[in-house]
Amino acid sequence: MEDDGRLAPRQIWARPTSTTTRSYVPGCTPFLLPSDGYVYLNRTYSISLGENAIYDPACTSTPTTTEHAGAALDIHDPFYASVTPLLYAMGCATVVSYLLVIILLITPRTFYVGGPGGGANFLGRHGMVSGSYSNNSSVVGVGGRPWLQKVAALLVAISLTIATADSFRVAEKQYDHGYSDAEALTSEVIDGTEIKVVRIISSTFLWLAQVQTLIRLFPRHKEKVMIKWAGFALIVLDTIFAILDKFLVKTNTTRPRLYEDAIPALSYLFELALNLLYAAWVIFYSLSKHRFAFFHPKMRNICLVALLSLCAVLIPVVFFVLDIAKPEIAGWGTYIRWVGSAAASVVVWEWVERIEALERDERKDGILGREVFDGDEMIEVTPSEEVDWPRQQFHGHDRGGGTGMSSAWGGVMGLAHRPLRPRGGRITQTQREAEGATAAKSRKRRSARPTPPPAAVTPVSRADTTSAASTVYNVHYYPVSSPTPPVAMPFMEEEDEGSDGDGEKELAVVQNQQSSLPTQDTYTEPRRQNSPQIVNVDNRWRFILNPFKNRHAALPREVASAQAEEEGFLSPDDQAPRQGDEENPHYTPRHRGLFSFHPMSDGASRRQSGADQPLPVTVIPARRRGQDTWSPQWFTNSNLVDRSSSRRTASRPRDQRMKVIQPQVQSAAPWTAADMEASFSSMDYELRYDPEAAALVSEDIPDHHSQPTQADSPAHPTMSGGNGPSGGETQSALDTGPGIEGSVNEGSVIEGPEESHSQR
């Protein structure tokens, strides 16, 4: 009976007494635990098996729930998707974020010190006061960070600090439970409420800082405005969709490829577009500034800054692509993109500062400033401050970059938009009289030549122009021993080359119309408005334009003969003006009526003569507007000649040294038949203007060249006049000369000896 209670060993499995079979659910089948082993229930309690044991799981209809479904060590994911690379990446990102904060807040300014030998020294602290260096200093300030970058970098550092703390907390929890899961760690940390809020705020300031950096890269004001508003619109859209994605849809952040809704896809799209546009424009700027952006002898470490800048702008774009291609690295790639966006603004700003410092150093000795475009309202703003968002100006030490240089360049750029102001203005009639009375005492030099009128587009009629009324032409004679006078440059004033005060000449304005004419007041104002403006320029220009100024050339014999008669023409008693001459409207003081092309040659001739003697002056008045010009038809058409002879009046001035030709009051021919016979009967030659002699010379008198230079030689043929009417013969002689058309116009003053007409 005792054997009935015992079971054979085979009956444990087979149970031969039972005629039914039992089926087990997969995973619920009992299994044997061999002897000589241990069964661990927890870390402190274990059971030793002295013999075999059977484990029969309690299978139910519902599966057993566990807190963590992963195994103790998940070996299915690669190493770069494990917890260890994730923690290292977060630690590095946090350290970089704090370095950016240190760069922005603790060391706000750096300086570029370029020596005369081309050397460079950066990161040298030379004081915190901007603009404390002179313009000649080679120290160029680089720095001055905008407050948007400071706020963005500080928020990124705070966000990464919170994320790092949460990551270590979750990793420790997984270690306590004996497993490690990187995906679970990332989901628990990034999907936290505090990280979501801080990340949205910091991302908004990061985009604003990047837009501010882009605004600085482009010089045109229109481009700055366009970038500002386009970037602001993209930032608003990205922020709105990010808020909807984080708090409304609550999608899987670590698996961007598994997006099934439109809101997270749009948020991802706007974020990717902002990073792509920023990277593209920074690369374009670096290529446009390739002379300074990648390497420069004065700043050899700029290549390192360029490398860091390019990496900072490309890291967000690269990790956006990797998030789609390899979702396993999306866990720690998010932190890299986060800190990369902060570095893309801070490092690129430093790069731009150094590029502009090199540009300022290169053009500091030039005369050109920075480019100014149409609509640019930031001409005199420093580069570091011109793109700042609205804020109050402080006089702190970290505002603006290179303010010492910008103050100097602001004045240079302002000169480019202001016309040159002449140093000598227009002279009124009262000023002329006052200067004429005191010119002998003051001895002030003025411009040697007036400003030439601008070139006309179409041919101008000589009868309609009013410029001849204010034009003065001077003809001087020089002895054979004097050098050829140099050609004076317009807008230039010759310096006093000698101590002899008699050699100083002044610009003369001759009033060549009588006060009795009714049209005198009509043309006074236009002539005054058309008067030339005088600008004093350095004397060294004369040598550049005329390097052969010391060349000596012999003058024609006619000029030498006229100069010989000029030296002994007047006596010292005639130098004082008579009382009646001052009342004459045609009276002009001698010191105002003379004009010198070269004071040295004129002073030499006067020292040879031993006396300061004035020259006689012939005044050719200007023709009225609308008056007919001289025509060869008057020689053949007697009607024109007879009609003009009845209207012309002649009078002689009181001063015998001056010949005044009366203007034509009506529109009539200036000559009569008798005048032409008297004028041209004894004149069988023509006059031409010789630029070397600066005088009117004859071409038809060959015997003058063979006669020696004497005091009684014939005078220069420029001084015409005779027994006919006082001014008619002179004007006819001047008008008949083929070379006088371009050299002697109406209103001309011709100086020369008076005996010339008596000898002819």
Swiss-Prot record:
Segments of skewed composition (Acidic residues): 492-501
PANTHER family tied to this protein: PH-RESPONSE REGULATOR PROTEIN PALH/RIM21, PH-RESPONSE REGULATOR PROTEIN PALH_RIM21
Residue ranges that the UniProt entry lists as topological domain Extracellular: 1-85, 172-194, 250-262, 323-328
Organism: Emericella nidulans (strain FGSC A4 / ATCC 38163 / CBS 112.46 / NRRL 194 / M139) (Aspergillus nidulans)
Top-rank lineage group of the source organism: Eukaryota
Family: Belongs to the palH/RIM21 family.
UniProt entry keywords in alphabetical sequence: Cell membrane, Membrane, Transmembrane, Transmembrane helix
Protein name as it appears in the record: pH-response regulator protein palH/RIM21
One Pfam family matching this protein: PalH
BP GO annotations: cellular response to pH
Basic and acidic residues bias (residue ranges): 575-585
Main subcellular localisation: membrane
InterPro entries hit by this protein: PalH
Cytoplasmic-side segments: 107-150, 216-228, 284-301, 350-760
Protein location: Cell membrane
Start and end residues of each stretch annotated as Disordered: 389-465, 479-503, 559-615, 629-666, 696-760
Bias type Polar residues, positions: 629-642
Gene responsible for this protein: palH
Membrane topology value: Multi-pass membrane protein
